[in-house]
C-alpha cells in the first residue's frame, strides 16, 4: 500500500482568530454572571428569558445601603446608581457605610424601602460560577417591590453591580446578546433596550 502525504496550508489569520474565539467560548463555564434573582412574596411566575420582563416596581424611592463587609467601593455604587438614573430610576442619595442605621438595615430580614449590598454568605449563595445574586420582595397583589438585597462575591466584575441593580428594580434575565440583563457575562454588555422607565 502506498501512502501519499498531502500538506494542507494553515487557515488565514482572520479565520484562525474566529476558530480560537469559538473554542474559548465553548470551553468557558456557561453561567458566569448572576444566578436568577430570588423573588419573595410573588406567586410563581413563568418568564421567557428571550423577552425582557419587569416583575415588580418600587412605589417608594429606595435608599441604597452598603453593608459593612460588602466587596464594593462607594464610588462604584455611585456609578451604578448614575447608570440607572440616566434611564429614569431614582434612588435616595444617602449611601450608609457604617453606624447603627447601616447595621440595623443590613441585619433586618425585611429592610422595607432599602436596597442593601452585602458580601455573599453560604446561606444566600449556591456554589458554582455565579458572581452575584439578588433577593427581593414583591407584593403579590400590587407588584410593588418592598426591599432588595444584593449579594456579591469578593471579586466584582464589570457590569455585575449594574446588572444586580436591575434585579433590585424588578428586571429579570434576557437572552439578548449585548444586553445588561443577559444572564451570562460573556454574552452581556451595556445594552439597555427596554430598561428605560416610562
Predicted feature residues:
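Metzincin-family zinc-dependent endopeptidase catalytic domain
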Residues: 74-168, 172
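Second-shell loop/turn segments in exported
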Residues: 63-73, 149-156, 186-190
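Sec-dependent N-terminal signal peptides
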Residues: 19-28
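The catalytic-center signature of Zn2+-dependent metalloproteases
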Residues: 153-198
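Short, positively charged low-complexity motifs
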Residues: 4-6
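Disordered inhibitory propeptide/activation segment of secreted metzincin zinc metalloprotease zymogens
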Residues: 30-72, 81, 85-86, 133-142
